[in-house]
């Protein structure tokens, strides 16, 4: 819709311009400050220029045009809105989608939590964001690949194995053991210890030479838990890349770095000169004892990713990784790639309340708020909605009790109620959507046209959400559209009115946009509300 309007305006103006959406839809659907850019050139006030330009659009078939305070305002005509509504309904649940125009557009790596414990609430924001970004990007025609990077080559895996051994000896065999704070705790450790006992027998907990075997077993069990948690919220990741499996590539990647001339040795330690590209200090990649650092593993992984030849790479990280960006981008540059192809999206912190009191999050202490805990409290729909309801650049705080309310204060309830209400009205009218598809919406009153316009801008919202990486604009749109619908419904009699079919068709478009948008954020729209 917006593109059609822009191309028509450009045909008349013949120059590039900015097209905005005024806050007041009663005033106009679109507006441009184009006249302000011409004031100096033509030595006239923007108001005079805008009024003169408006005359060029007289009797336009798509919109009425008028000027206010130097702005050109465009109000879409009923016939145009009706044709757009017909197109939307014919596309049904493909409304707003596009076919892929190319391959290997975006590679998204997200979550990538250490495989030493279940996902906690701090991981969920990146998980929901990454999955939603992939869903919506694919829907608007981009080729997207998703991956989870498994950090399974560091000391934390050894700690997992020792944690399982110590727990088994303490809890299963009633031994008095020292259990330092740095080791992992929690119900999942108990579950894994019991599984290990059944599979390997008691001896594995006492044989230090078998700690790696126990750690690998524990890692695999943790990954099963992580995959199950993700599946329960509808997140399916295409590839699971193991850090350990990439270490065969380490030597080749280090040679590539060395050939760039941006790697050097000092005190038998190997550094990359990341300060050359804005890092705070040069970073160690190989320790003096020959062991690679965590950064070295990450560089190997990014080398492997960039070899796949995607146009753009997105890493979704926690905000505490902000200082890590410069060193990774420097390494990518030194490997001969364009570092601007890597985009890092940071997730700010999440704090969770219940009955107004904060939960403490600490995976190792076994007192973390797990993703599965939240799921059991509020369900997948509320979880997915709340975690993209705010810009990722802002911290997120919410009370799970608020998300259980069945009233307008709970946004997911309010939005679902709008969708269910449309079905309710059709049932009351004893009609189906197909019965009214031929109704003409050209003569809706202003409030009806504005509601229709709001329902029809869904494709623009989706495009903007992806290109600006502002996925919170989708739940904001859903809340706004639902509020507009409820207001219109409360102010207008539908069943039995002279324009019943027109209003039912209008509601069909509203319900379609709600259904499509909810689906894209991983939520199935409710056809009826259950109390």
From Swiss-Prot:
Short motif 'HIGH' region, span: 113-123
Catalytic activity: tRNA(Arg) + L-arginine + ATP = L-arginyl-tRNA(Arg) + AMP + diphosphate
Matches recorded under InterPro entries: aa-tRNA-synth_I_CS, Arg-tRNA-ligase, Arg-tRNA-synth_N, Arg-tRNA-synth_N_sf, ArgRS_core, DALR_anticod-bd, Rossmann-like_a/b/a_fold, tRNAsynth_Ia_anticodon-bd
Localization per record: Cytoplasm
Pfam families attached to this UniProt entry: Arg_tRNA_synt_N, DALR_1, tRNA-synt_1d
GO cellular component: cytoplasm
Signal sequence annotation: none
Superkingdom per UniProt: Bacteria
CDD domains from the UniProt entry: ArgRS_core
UniProt keyword list: Aminoacyl-tRNA synthetase, ATP-binding, Cytoplasm, Ligase, Nucleotide-binding, Protein biosynthesis
E.C. numbers: 6.1.1.19
MF (Gene Ontology): arginine-tRNA ligase activity; ATP binding
GO biological process: arginyl-tRNA aminoacylation
HAMAP family per the UniProt record, alphabetical: Arg_tRNA_synth
Family per record: Belongs to the class-I aminoacyl-tRNA synthetase family.
Subunit structure: Monomer.
Full protein name: Arginine--tRNA ligase
Annotated source species: Campylobacter fetus subsp. fetus (strain 82-40)
